[in-house]
Amino acid sequence: ASVLNAYSLVNSQGVYGGQRRAAPDQRVFVLTRSAYAGQQRYAAATWSGDVTSTWTALRQQVAGGLGFSLSGIPYLTVDIGGFSVPGRFSRKDPLPEDAEEWRELNTRWFQYGTFLPLTRVHGEVPKREMWEMGGESHPAYQAHLKFDRLRYRMLPYVYSLAGGVTHESGTFLRPLVMDFPSDAAARRVADQYLF
């Protein structure tokens, strides 16, 4: 029987096998835009690609991540803050209201990213580092710092979840329907999950 659209699985398998042969004593990690059920066995994690830096895209990332989880693909990450930035945010001297909206959007995205299997900030302009969010006294900086510290405190828990993925067919993101399958309301919720 032939398998259609298995590119990601075969690609991840090839990269994994090549890395294991080249460096058998080192762990392998494959970050890929493509996805296929079972690719996690080859140390592959999917990221959602170069999405736009908008509120709509942030909402879509949450729903998309839950879809990945329900599809049996547990390792997911995003470009926190988005990657393709609207011009009003990326100007050399953005309007004050645009700069403030960027900080708020980036902060909310960072908070979401704290509760993903892989927390990953990525992008160029505007800067996404917490110290670029308006200085140490700015609420955006303080929120980034708080959630960064929270993520580090959660690392033992995240490692435990990873063990559950490997040994118990678990997942990181659990849409409400996974824990409350008899609840009709939980089946309709596409923007909340347990971690």
Regions found by a protein language model. Name each.
Residues 1-195:
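Catalytic-domain carbohydrate-binding cleft regions of carbohydrate-active enzymes
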